[in-house]
Amino acid sequence: MRLSMIRILLAEDDAAMRQYLERALERAGYAVTGVDRGTAALPLLETERFDLLLTDIVMPEMDGIELAQRAGAIAPDMRVMFITGFAAVTLKAGKAVPQAKVLSKPFHLRDLVLEVDRLFDIGSASGLN
C-alpha cells in the first residue's frame, strides 16, 4: 500500500491531542511517530527519514517554527505542516517557513487527513485547490 510508506513525525505537547491526531492519521494509512516536544523530534530527524513534519507551533523548550527551521536543515525535502490555535502565530509561521501549510485549530480530523493527502497528491484530494 502506497500510504504505508509515507512517514509522519508529529510534534504536539498536548498528550490527548497527539493521540487523537496519531489515531486519525494511522487510520488513514500513514505511519506516525509522535513526540511531545520539538527537542524530542530533532534526534529522530537525524536518524530516521520522515516525509512530513506535522507540528504544533506553541510548545515548551522549542516552538514548532524553530523545529521546522532546524528540520529543514537536516531534511530539506521533508514537507512541513503547522497546527495552531493562535492566529498571530499563523502569520509568524507563514513568514518563517513560507512553503509550510498551516492548519488552524479547531479543525475536523477529516480536514487534517485531506490536507495531508493533498500534500502527497493522494486520493480524491488530488488536483484540488
Language-model regions, residue ranges each:
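Short hydrophobic/Thr-rich beta-strand motif most characteristic of the beta2 strand and flanking loop
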Residues: G29-D36, L44
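Conserved acidic carboxylate
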Residues: E12
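Charged docking surfaces used in two-component/phosphorelay signaling
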Residues: Q19-R27
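Active-site residues of response regulator receiver
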Residues: D56
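Non-catalytic signal-transmission and effector/linker regions of two-component phosphorelay proteins
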Residues: M1-L9, R110-N129
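Receiver (REC) domain active-site loop signature in two-component systems and cognate sites
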Residues: M59
